[in-house]
């Protein structure tokens, strides 16, 4: 006979840590940096604080492959009595609300702790203080995987003399720095693109980054909302009914769902064949299933609210891409809110051109979900499909070209293609919005390139004519006895009038993409 037993949730995740991105020492180190950075960003920008984040990786034992990771932020901090559960209890989080978060399950920090203690048997060190707190709390914590509860190895309190607020975390883990280094660098730089209001300082064994704050403008913070009628399942509905005893169906719909007023609720119940005055607790199991089916089918609901979401915004995308990619020009678009299955989402796209972007046979793609850079599984992402199928020739782009594409999806529920959460699935509504966003951004690029072509034509015409100015001025000077320099200056002015732009204006707009050498332009320019 088989012996049956229940596996505690913390132990299950410890055994299946690859589901949270902790596949091996390389991915684990990258994932640790990612989890700590994203928690720091959520603890700052969501509360109107400009993020300042310090990160450090040290080699602790080269023979064992042990490294330490330290992260510190200036966020709102964690109340002292909550620190043990936040770091030591799986599925304990402040993120179980209907609004946009970087994290989804409240699992990331706990997976860092589980991986750390599984590979080094060392606790996580946490120090935190909330806004205006008189005390700083410090803990050393491990997780009891059998009871899914924190093990507090040490607890201390310090007076907060300088009114510091934020959270500092230090963990020891098995990690491959050399293999993870490039991914970590890419991740932090891509984070700086979509969050140019953050200052991120990173120090590794042989890598230092100082990603400066480029703007003080923060994106709007997402608001917490009620579920949309199309987004619930039977179990969710049953839980909501248990908390709504005594309500009629009409009252239940109005109080528990987003954008459902009395008129909308009455129209739906009449269409679905339900008595609006029936007690919601009196619904039979069959009626519950019918109610959910009808809620999904009904087309009279309003769209989900967009203030649950926090897109980066075209301005911040342009600032970030120019700063980090060194692009000559960036054109960004934020689409209007749409929904899939009752879940609101917004797609943003940006195209970056020229500058320090190297020419390639296809666009460099930078993918984001809820402001999180996605670095793995690019081939499985619907964004890669959209970019590859896009007809770039219609927008004056000829490959190889110095082109980068940024696609960001923000939603209360990102439809990931796999448990690794590194690629967005092919949801028709999201794919359509990606295509439209990319088209809108590419139209702006086409206008820009068309103008550059015309300016290049004029610059080449100027250079062709200007090559003869010195000789003509010399000959005219011999005939008229007028100074050659004065004649040359007048001839250059005549050419500029004919073209309609000064040489300084032409060079400013076109030199960076011109096939004409800088020496040619300098030679043809009046000194």
Swiss-Prot record:
It catalyses: ATP-dependent breakage, passage and rejoining of double-stranded DNA. ATP binds at residues 39, 73, 94-95, 103-110, 421. InterPro entries: HATPase_C_sf, Ribosomal_Su5_D2-typ_SF, Ribosomal_uS13-like_H2TH, Ribsml_uS5_D2-typ_fold_subgr, TopoVI_B, TopoVI_B_transducer. It holds the Pfam family Topo-VIb_trans. One of its GO terms (cellular component) is small ribosomal subunit. GO terms for molecular function: ATP binding; DNA binding; DNA topoisomerase type II (double strand cut, ATP-hydrolyzing) activity. Gene3D superfamilies: 1.10.8.50, 3.30.230.10, Histidine kinase-like ATPase, C-terminal domain. Its EC number is 5.6.2.2. GO terms for biological process: DNA topological change. Keywords: ATP-binding, DNA-binding, Isomerase, Nucleotide-binding, Topoisomerase. Homodimer. Heterotetramer of two Top6A and two Top6B chains. Belongs to the TOP6B family. Relaxes both positive and negative superturns and exhibits a strong decatenase activity. NCBIfam families: PRK04184.1 (NF003218), top6b (TIGR01052). This is Type 2 DNA topoisomerase 6 subunit B. It comes from Pyrobaculum aerophilum (strain ATCC 51768 / DSM 7523 / JCM 9630 / CIP 104966 / NBRC 100827 / IM2). The lineage of its organism: Archaea, Thermoproteota, Thermoprotei, Thermoproteales, Thermoproteaceae. The gene is top6B.
């Amino acid at each position: 006979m088989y012996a049956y037993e229940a596996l505690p949730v913390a132990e299950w995740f410890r055994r299946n840590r690859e589901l949270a991105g902790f596949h091996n020492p390389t991915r684990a180190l990258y994932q640790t940096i990612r989890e700590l950075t994203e928690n720091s960003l959520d603890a700052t920008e969501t509360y109107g604080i400009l993020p300042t984040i310090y990160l450090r990786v040290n080699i602790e034992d080269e023979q064992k492959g042990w490294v330490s990771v330290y992260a510190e932020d200036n966020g709102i901090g964690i109340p002292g009595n909550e620190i043990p559960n936040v770091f030591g209890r799986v599925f304990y989080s402040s993120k179980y609300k209907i609004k946009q978060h970087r994290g989804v399950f409240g699992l990331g920090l706990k997976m860092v702790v589980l991986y750390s203690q599984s590979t080094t048997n060392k606790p996580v060190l946490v120090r935190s203080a909330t806004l205006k707190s008189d005390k700083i709390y410090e803990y050393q914590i491990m997780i009891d995987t059998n009871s899914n509860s924190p093990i507090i190895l040490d607890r201390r309190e310090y007076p907060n003399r300088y009114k510091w607020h934020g959270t500092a975390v230090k963990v020891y883990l098995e990690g491959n720095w050399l293999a993870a280094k490039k991914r970590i660098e890419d991740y932090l730089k891509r984070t700086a693109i979509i969050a140019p209001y953050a200052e991120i300082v990173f120090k590794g064994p042989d890598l230092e980054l100082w990603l400066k704050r480029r703007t003080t403008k923060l994106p709007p913070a997402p608001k917490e909302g009620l579920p949309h009628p199309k987004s619930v399942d039977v179990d969710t509905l049953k839980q909501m009914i248990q908390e709504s005893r005594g309500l009629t169906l009409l009252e239940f719909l109005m109080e528990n769902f987003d954008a459902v007023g009395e008129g909308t609720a009455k129209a739906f119940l009449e269409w679905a064949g339900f008595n609006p005055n029936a007690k919601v607790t009196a619904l039979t199991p069959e009626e519950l299933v019918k109610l959910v089916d009808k809620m999904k089918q009904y087309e009279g609901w309003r769209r989900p609210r967009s203030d649950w979401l926090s897109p980066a915004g075209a301005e911040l995308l342009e600032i970030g891409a120019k700063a980090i990619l060194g692009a000559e020009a960036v054109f960004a678009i934020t689409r209007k809110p749409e929904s899939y299955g009752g879940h609101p989402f917004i797609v943003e796209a940006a195209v970056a051109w020229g500058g320090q972007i190297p020419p390639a046979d296809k666009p460099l793609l930078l993918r984001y979900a809820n402001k999180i850079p996605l670095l793995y599984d690019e081939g499985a992402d619907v964004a890669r499909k959209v970019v590859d199928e896009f007809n770039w020739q219609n927008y004056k782009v000829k490959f190889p070209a110095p082109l980068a594409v940024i696609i960001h999806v923000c939603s209360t529920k990102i439809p990931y293609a796999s448990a690794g959460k590194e690629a967005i699935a092919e949801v028709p509504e999201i794919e359509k919005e990606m295509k439209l966003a990319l088209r809108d951004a590419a139209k702006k690029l086409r206008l820009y390139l068309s103008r550059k072509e015309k300016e290049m034509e004029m610059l080449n015409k100027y250079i062709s004519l200007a090559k003869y100015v010195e000789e003509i001025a010399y000959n005219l000077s011999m005939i008229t006895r007028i100074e050659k320099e004065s004649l040359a200056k007048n001839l250059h002015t005549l050419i500029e009038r004919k073209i309609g732009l000064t040489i300084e204006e032409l060079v400013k707009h076109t030199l960076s993409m011109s096939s004409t050498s800088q020496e040619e332009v300098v030679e043809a320019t009046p000194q």
